Amino acid sequence: KDLQEKLNVPIQGWFAQKNQFDMEPVFNRTKNIRGFQISSPSLIGLRSVNVSCEIYRSAKMDNIINKAHTGTKLMIDLYDQWLRELGFKLMTPRDSLKRGCHISLMHEHAKKISRALRKFDRVIVDYRTPNQIRIAISPLYNTYNEVYKGFKKIKKCVEGEKYLDIGDESSKVT
């Protein structure tokens, strides 16, 4: 609450106006959290938020967290079984309480591998400079089978050296 008075609002909406319905020519922000509002929330936006909350409520947060831990554990197990011997190095903590829903792998050809996976196998991973690939599970909708298949495609991409056919040109999206 202390910051509410100090922060400037970059977009000045009429809902944040001190005397909202006076329609004054000069913006005079209200002094509380209402000063950050821009306008009326859209019905579609509100409905989307409501549906999202319902999904999380029905899935139960403990189940989501458990699936995130189990999913990243599966990824680390597949790394140990398949990818370590292919030159990958695990950068993510093995302790599930010290990681989120993704793991990070280092490889000298990470950029080309990530681009080859997208181009040839329709597997989307995040590339981070200078040489890391981040792989995530979204616990609400990814299955363990999808994780397995994705890692199998990574293994085949590297074993078959598909990534060598990829140029070094930059891509804004990883």
Residue ranges and their predicted role:
Residues 65-76, 80-121, 148:
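Conserved PLP-binding catalytic core of the aspartate aminotransferase-like
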Residues 13-37, 77, 91-99, 124, ...:
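PLP-dependent class I/II
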Residues 1-67, 73:
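Active-site C-terminal subdomain of aminotransferase-like
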Residues 33, 98-102, 130-134:
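Short, solvent-exposed beta-strand edge segments and adjacent coil->beta transition regions
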Residues 55, 78, 82, 157:
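Short alpha-helical functional segments enriched in proximate histidine and acidic residues
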Residues 39-43, 107, 141-144:
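Short, solvent-exposed loop/helix junctions and linker helices
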Residues 115-174:
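PLP-dependent enzyme catalytic core of the Aspartate aminotransferase-like
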